[in-house]
Amino acid sequence: MLWKITDNVKYEEDCEDRHDSSSNGNPRIPHLSSPGQHLYSPAPPLSHTGVAEYQPPPYFPPPYQQLAYSQSADHYSHLGEAYAAAMNPLHQPAATGSQQQAWPGRQSQEGSSLASHHSRSASLIPHISGLEGGSVSARREVYRRSDLLLPHAHALEAGLAENLGLHEMAHPIEEVQNVDDAHLLLHDQTVIRKGPISMTKNPLGLPCQKDLVGVVMNPSEVFCSVPGRLSLLSSTSKYKVTVAEVQRRLSPPECLNASLLGGVLRRAKSKNGGRSLREKLDKIGLNLPAGRRKAAHVTLLTSLVEGEAVHLARDFAYVCEAEFPSKAVADYLTRPHLGGRNEMATRKSMLLAAQQVCKEFTDLLHQDRTPNGNNRPAQVLEPNIQNCLSHFSLITHGFGSQAICAAVSAVQNYIKEALIAIDKSYMNPGDQSPADSSKTMEKMEKHRK
């Protein structure tokens, strides 16, 4: 509506100018010679140009030369020449050559009518400002608010940001984005997968979300059942593998890859075996990166699950306790040290010291609290020594510490038998000669045979 008012004002001014020029004997358009040709509406001012989105119909059909409309750099051109000059006189576009040729008489009249334009525009500015809101809202599709106020756009945005507090809101948003990016960078850094996984139901039947940030939701859950490797065909037994055990196999010190873990779990080799295993582990919250390299040397114990390794250690302890020939070894090793009371006393003191050392060693191993199977006992030892014992136990899948305890127990049984033999010899009369003692030893050997 604003540009219509502007055109009406300019039309009245042009009619007055044409009337003045005709009264002085100077016609408005001198090169028209045809009497039947009618006069057309005056041309728009030189500064009035259209926009790319809306092309108004030309005011002057043939034989007049048609104006070449171009995109103006003036952002106030839709308000008209007078108002654009009053608002921003530094942004007036220069007249093109075609405009100067089409309207030669108009240029001579610009200077005379400029003063009257400014005076009338000053009186119309209050009315136009009142209509500005409606006109701009009606032409939102053609002009944006930032385009109309382009010279002051940065200052306006700064003022809005200051009044609305947008500059304070931008910093928390950026911090949240940085935290999310930093959280995404943790991918493949640990065995436990970060972030929430699929919904499951707890024992009460209520859905709960596994938000795995450093822990596995249910470590005691059975992941699969694995047949034993060392059992006979007639007594094949299966061992349950828990989620916690799988996590220990993927964590240091072993860091098994998909191929080795599939062998431990007795999974048949297939084309997509590694991918299916990774997907199954991902469902329980464990991360197994593709192309991973193992960290520890592979041994026969690597192929055993913890249940079978512990079973093997218990059987080994039973065999050591029941079948190891502790008495025969003690008698054989004690015979050379029965020459005299002093020698037997020295030997006895050495055996007592060894017995004390073995007792301290086994007591330390019995205090090992490395998690195994479903057992997660509380730590008793200091963290530095417990970490070392846990490293050995994890490498051997729980077999190592129990097997060493069984072996040291066999050594302790030998020491007990050796002390008994020395005590028997010490209680005998000490007047025996070396020859008699040698004969006694020969008799003992024959008796053993």
Curated annotation (Swiss-Prot):
Induction: During retinoic acid-mediated differentiation. This is Transcription factor AP-2 gamma. Belongs to the AP-2 family. The gene is Tfap2c. One of its GO terms (molecular function) is DNA-binding transcription factor activity. InterPro entries: TF_AP2, TF_AP2_C, TF_AP2_gamma. The PPxY motif mediates interaction with WWOX. Binds DNA as a dimer. Can form homodimers or heterodimers with other AP-2 family members. Interacts with WWOX. Interacts with UBE2I. Interacts with KCTD1; this interaction represses transcription activation. Interacts with CITED2 (via C-terminus); the interaction stimulates TFAP2B-transcriptional activity. Interacts with CITED4. Interacts with MTA1. Residues 292-423 are annotated as: H-S-H (helix-span-helix), dimerization. Expressed in lung, ovary and testis. Expressed in most squamous epithelia. Also, detected in several exocrine glands including the prostate, the preputial and salivary glands, serous glands of the tongue and ocular harderian glands. The keyword Methyltransferase does not apply. The keyword Transferase does not apply. There is a cross-link at residue 10 (Glycyl lysine isopeptide (Lys-Gly) (interchain with G-Cter in SUMO)). PANTHER family: TRANSCRIPTION FACTOR AP-2 (PTHR10812), TRANSCRIPTION FACTOR AP-2 GAMMA (PTHR10812:SF9). The lineage of its organism: Eukaryota, Metazoa, Chordata, Craniata, Vertebrata. One of its GO terms (biological process) is regulation of DNA-templated transcription. Keywords: Activator, DNA-binding, Isopeptide bond, Nucleus, Phosphoprotein, Transcription, Transcription regulation, Ubl conjugation. Residues 112-124 have a biased composition (Low complexity). Sequence-specific DNA-binding transcription factor that interacts with cellular enhancer elements to regulate transcription of selected genes, and which plays a key role in early embryonic development. AP-2 factors bind to the consensus sequence 5'-GCCNNNGGC-3' and activate genes involved in a large spectrum of important biological functions. TFAP2C plays a key role in early embryonic development by regulating both inner cell mass (ICM) and trophectoderm differentiation. At the 8-cell stage, during morula development, controls expression of cell-polarity genes. Residues 95-111 have a biased composition (Polar residues). Sumoylated on Lys-10; which inhibits transcriptional activity. GO terms for cellular component: mitochondrion; nucleoplasm; nucleus. A motif (PPxY motif) lies at residues 59-64.
